[in-house]
C-alpha cells in the first residue's frame, strides 16, 4: 500500500513529550477526518483534544505543515505495518498479492479516520505545494513495495506480467479510488469489493 516514510527526530524528548505529541497527532487525524483539511486549524484540533491552548501544539510542532508531516508519517507507518504483516504470512506470491489488496481494505475498516485523514492530506498537496510534505507525500504514493512483489513473483514463475510497474500503478490507483468513492457514497460491502478487485488483478498476473 505505502512505503514507510522517513521518521522524524525523536532524540531528546521525554516520555511525557512523546505522549503529548502522539495525542496531538491522533486529535489531528480525527479532526481532518471530521471537518476536512480546509477547516483543520490548531484551534479546531485544540477543541477536539480538549487542550487548553494552541500554544501546546506550537510547542511540539512549528506549524501546520510540520504537524501534517508527522500525521502523514504516522498513518503511512501504521498502514505499512499492517500490510507487511499480512503479506509476510503468505507463502506464495499470488497469496502475497491477495494479502496486499486485502490489507488496504482491512486498514480502511480498522482505521477509517486514518484513511480519511490521509485522503484529506493528499487533496491538500494536490491543491497547493507544501514543501514540508514532499517526501512523505512521495512515500504515501509509492508503489515500490508492490512493484518488488510483482517482479519477485515473475522471477519465481508464478506471474506472467509484461510490465510490473504499470500493473502496480493500476492496482494502487484502484485501491486509492476505492477510498475516495467509499467516503463519498459510503459503500457498505467492502468485502465484496475487495474480492472483486482481487479477482481482477490476480487474473492480470496470468496474462502473457
What do these predicted regions represent?
Residues 12-13, 69-99:
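Amphipathic alpha-helical linker/stalk segments
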Residues 24, 28-32, 104, 201:
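Short hydrophobic clusters on alpha-helical segments that form packing/core surfaces
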Residues 84-114, 167-171:
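Hydrophobic alpha-helical connector segments
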Amino acid at each position: 500500500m505505502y512505503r514507510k516514510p522517513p521518521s522524524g527526530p525523536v532524540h531528546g524528548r521525554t516520555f511525557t513529550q512523546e505522549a503529548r505529541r502522539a495525542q496531538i497527532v491522533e486529535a489531528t487525524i480525527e479532526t481532518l477526518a471530521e471537518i476536512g483539511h480546509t477547516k483543520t486549524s490548531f484551534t479546531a484540533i485544540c477543541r477536539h483534544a480538549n487542550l487548553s491552548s494552541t500554544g501546546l501544539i506550537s510547542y511540539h510542532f512549528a506549524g501546520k505543515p510540520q504537524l501534517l508531516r508527522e500525521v502523514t508519517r504516522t498513518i503511512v507507518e501504521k498502514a505499512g505495518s499492517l500490510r507487511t504483516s499480512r503479506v509476510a504470512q503468505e507463502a506464495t506470491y499470488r497469496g502475497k498479492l491477495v494479502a496486499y489488496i486485502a490489507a488496504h481494505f482491512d486498514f480502511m475498516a480498522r482505521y477509517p479516520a486514518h484513511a480519511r485523514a490521509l485522503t484529506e492530506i493528499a487533496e491538500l498537496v494536490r491543491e497547493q505545494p507544501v514543501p514540508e510534505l514532499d517526501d512523505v507525500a512521495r512515500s504515501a504514493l509509492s508503489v515500490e513495495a508492490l512493484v518488488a512483489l510483482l517482479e519477485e513473483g515473475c522471477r519465481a514463475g508464478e506471474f506472467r506480467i509484461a510490465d510490473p510497474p504499470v500493473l502496480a500503478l493500476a492496482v494502487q490507483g484502484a485501491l486509492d479510488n476505492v477510498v475516495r468513492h467509499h467516503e463519498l457514497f459510503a459503500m457498505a460491502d467492502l468485502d465484496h469489493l475487495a474480492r472483486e478487485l482481487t479477482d481482477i488483478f490476480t487474473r492480470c498476473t496470468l496474462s502473457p
